[in-house]
Amino acid sequence: MTETSTVSIASSAIVCVEADIKGEVIIKEGCVVHPFVVFDATKGPIYVGENNIFEEYAVIRNNSDGQPMIIGDWNIFQVHSKSSAKYVGSRNVIGVHAVLEDGCSVSDDCSVGAKCTVFSHQNLEPSVSVYAATNLSRTTKTPNMTSPHQIEFLRKILPSYHHLYGKKKAVATASASAAQ
């Protein structure tokens, strides 16, 4: 985090200190931010909803010159994904090395496959999947559901292995009965 950052992290959010957070970023309840994630809000604020997962090396960058970037609830930004979207709704999966270009918009229950791109000023309707090397798209009938078990597991395990913003690292201790 830089000196000019205004970061608000909810008490139940897990944010590893190796994450790079710049500018005005608000991270709400239950989110999990892995090491080496980048939040770059130097050109405009980033507002992150509840229970999102940001995996290693995901880059979330607001390039809008003052307009807020809004990310809804229960999204997964997988490893090395990049987003400069002005809006990402809820229950979306942004795949490994996927790119959401400047100014695009992703509604709810969408899936952007590995190495796929949502282009600038493109707006994905609800329940659209983008797939294949040519960025084909189709409407799906089944909504995306982030597993509450996955996010709960990450909230428990990451503090054991990483330092967190605003929290002390968990330390395993042996009980008195085990020591005897």
UniProtKB/Swiss-Prot annotation:
Keywords: Cytoplasm, Cytoskeleton. It is found in: Cytoplasm, Cytoskeleton. InterPro entries: DCTN6, Trimer_LpxA-like_sf. GO terms for cellular component: cytoplasm; dynactin complex. Its main location: cytoplasm. The keyword Transmembrane does not apply. The keyword Cytoplasm applies. GO terms for molecular function: dynein complex binding. GO terms for biological process: mitotic spindle organization. Transmembrane segments: none annotated. Signal peptide: none annotated. Part of the dynactin complex that activates the molecular motor dynein for ultra-processive transport along microtubules. Belongs to the dynactin subunits 5/6 family. Dynactin subunit 6 subfamily. Subunit of dynactin, a multiprotein complex part of a tripartite complex with dynein and a adapter, such as BICDL1, BICD2 or HOOK3. The dynactin complex is built around ACTR1A/ACTB filament and consists of an actin-related filament composed of a shoulder domain, a pointed end and a barbed end. This is Dynactin subunit 6. It comes from Caenorhabditis elegans. The lineage of its organism: Eukaryota, Metazoa, Ecdysozoa, Nematoda, Chromadorea.
